[in-house]
Amino acid sequence: INVIALAMPLFTMNVYDRVIPNRAIETLWVLALGVILLFAVDLMLRLLRGYFIDLASARIDMQLSAQIMDRVLGVRMEARPAAVGAFSSNLRSFEAVRDFITSASVTAFIDLPFALLFVFVIALIAWQLVIPVLLAIIAVVIYAYILQHKMQSLAETTYRAGALRNATLIESLTALETIKTQGAEGVMQSKWEKSVAFVSRVNNQMRFLSAAATNGAMEVQQLVNVVTIIAGVYLIGEGMLSMGGLIACTMLASRAVAPLGQMVGLLMQYHNAKTSLTSLDEVMKKPVERPADASFVHRPELRGDIEFGNVEFSYPGSSIPALKGLSCRIAAGERVVVIGRVGSGKTTLQKLLLGLYQPTAGAVMIDGVDVRQLDPADLRRNIGYVSQDPTLFYGTLRDNIAIGAPYADDAAIVAAAEIAGLTEFVNRHPEGFDMLIGERGDSLSGGQRQSVAIARAVLMDPPILLLDEPTSSMDYTSEQQFKQRLKTFAGHKTVIIVTHRNSLLDLATRIVVVDDGQVVANGPRDQVMQALQSGQIGRAT
């Protein structure tokens, strides 16, 4: 394409220097037809170049977005960002990289080396005219160098401010009910307006610098034309250059400086893309649960024999240990209820069993294998988990129940719903399992959300059940019915229930009391209950 760009200057030079003085009309038409043919080829090449750039961009977009999502889903919990809104802004930053790749930047990079070709052709026609072109190139490079430092600083500031603004928006949407009930609309509105105003100011500075860069490069390009013409007139007067040669050199000078002008105009996009790429690199460097070089023990089926061996653990960013040398063994098939004060470490036990976090000392064993050595997919396939605050997703009730097993058949879904106590609720709704669940399950009550979470946990009939306050939002009748169904379903499964409700204690064959990250009582239900009632917790074994 850039070689074909030489056609017009050379055509013009030959017309002025040879065709017009000699009235060579036939030569004119031959040259014109040749140039028209080259223009047709140029059009085809430009279309093909655009097509291949778009195709490459689409592939990069798909591959990069897939890798980012894979990294997000695989990130270890301790590396999970505290601010979800800011993190989502980081994830979207790949769009800036994609836009830079698909913009005129690629074309400008391709055209840049050919500036030397145009300078070389100018030198062949009149070497003296190379001097203003080289001076213009140097001037554009210095000008861009001066601007790019400030642009880099503004791009980083814009990125951070945009992430803060996005975090405010996400927090406001997800906590809208709390904001309304607490009368915090004014606080969030003020926070939003301040972040938007700051982003707007920085963006204005970025746009000003970008305009200054683009317009400055255009001025240099125009000046080089003027200087080339002035110098060319003197060369013509001395008989060192023809009129056609001057016109050709003027056209070539513009072509030589144009790619640099384009590059300067793309400085803002470049710095935005560079900042975004740095952010993406931080995301991709986060530790994941299944590193590519890791080798896990493959255990598709687990019995449910669990042991905590002198386990110590602190949550990321916390100096207070959640577990302090905790030791406990749960045999396969046992139903254990874990009780204790708020913040004593009960929920942490279940999270360590799931491999969501790793102990800082000691080991968590299942069937004699350290949880850290088990493939996370195998581990969680064998565990049904109900969290304290279950999260539902936008979609149908069927989709929410089978979110971890999308190929589960209707019979399994119906059976899971029956165990969870959802059958009556489903039968009352005209759409049944196809009823639409709002984002985060806001259209359901707390008890219904818990029932959906229970249905998820039992859907694939896992050998281990971890239930964290599974009935905290249920009424007495629903809780009693659930207890009866759970006793039937549990059978020989290993069940660990974390609760504050005494009504669930009769599900246990054994009770473990946890306090301040340590087991202070561990024994048969009746024995521990008696010790609790008499105040002799330390003697319950």
Which residue ranges define each predicted feature?
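Transmembrane helix-loop-helix hairpins at lipid-water interfaces of multipass membrane proteins
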Residues: I1-L48, F52, L124, Q128, ...
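Hydrophobic alpha-helical segments in the permease module
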Residues: V35-R46, I137-A139, S210-Q221, M243-G265
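Loop segments that connect adjacent transmembrane helices in multi-pass transporters
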Residues: A66, D70-R71, V75-A83, T157-M206, ...
